[in-house]
């Protein structure tokens, strides 16, 4: 039986394999959630470059947050990454949730990124 870490890695690889088939050259909005923070970055896989990034550890957000581990913090990160992506000229992305289910903080970040101007 696979360990929890192996199962998460397998699920993340399955999601990314599907994304590559539907991406059509679009950059991906990759999300990582830890117990204390949330991170998001827009990655151009063709060029191998990060186009925009934001997290609850950014100086812009750190002072205004009570904690980096709630849906309000995730929504602020989503709005910030959408703003930075639009400055980089990116509006259309594919959403890479990794091994995380689309619920709670991940959903809050995605909804805020959509409101900020990203389409996926």
Curated annotation (Swiss-Prot):
It holds the Pfam family Ribosomal_L18p. Transmembrane segments: none annotated. Keywords: Ribonucleoprotein, Ribosomal protein, RNA-binding, rRNA-binding. It comes from the Bacteria. Coiled coil: none annotated. Gene3D superfamilies: 3.30.420.100. The keyword rRNA-binding applies. InterPro entries: Ribosomal_uL18_bac-type (IPR004389), Ribosomal_uL18_bac/euk (IPR005484). GO terms for biological process: translation. GO terms for molecular function: 5S rRNA binding; structural constituent of ribosome. The keyword Lipid metabolism does not apply. One of its GO terms (cellular component) is cytosolic large ribosomal subunit. Belongs to the universal ribosomal protein uL18 family. NCBIfam families: L18_bact. Part of the 50S ribosomal subunit; part of the 5S rRNA/L5/L18/L25 subcomplex. Contacts the 5S and 23S rRNAs. This is one of the proteins that bind and probably mediate the attachment of the 5S RNA into the large ribosomal subunit, where it forms part of the central protuberance. This is Large ribosomal subunit protein uL18. It comes from Rhizobium leguminosarum bv. trifolii (strain WSM2304). The gene is rplR.
């Amino acid at each position: 039986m696979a360990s929890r870490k192996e199962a998460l890695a397998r699920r993340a690889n399955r999601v990314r394999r599907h994304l590559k088939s539907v991406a059509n050259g679009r950059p991906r909005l990759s999300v990582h959630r830890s117990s204390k923070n949330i991170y998001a970055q827009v990655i151009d896989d063709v060029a191998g470059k990060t186009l925009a990034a934001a997290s609850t550890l950014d100086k812009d957000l750190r002072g205004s947050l009570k904690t980096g581990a709630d849906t309000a913090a995730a929504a602020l990160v989503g709005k910030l990454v959408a703003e930075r992506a639009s400055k980089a000229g990116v509006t259309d992305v594919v959403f890479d949730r990794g091994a995380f289910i689309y619920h709670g903080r991940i959903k809050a970040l995605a909804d805020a990124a959509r409101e900020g101007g990203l389409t996926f």
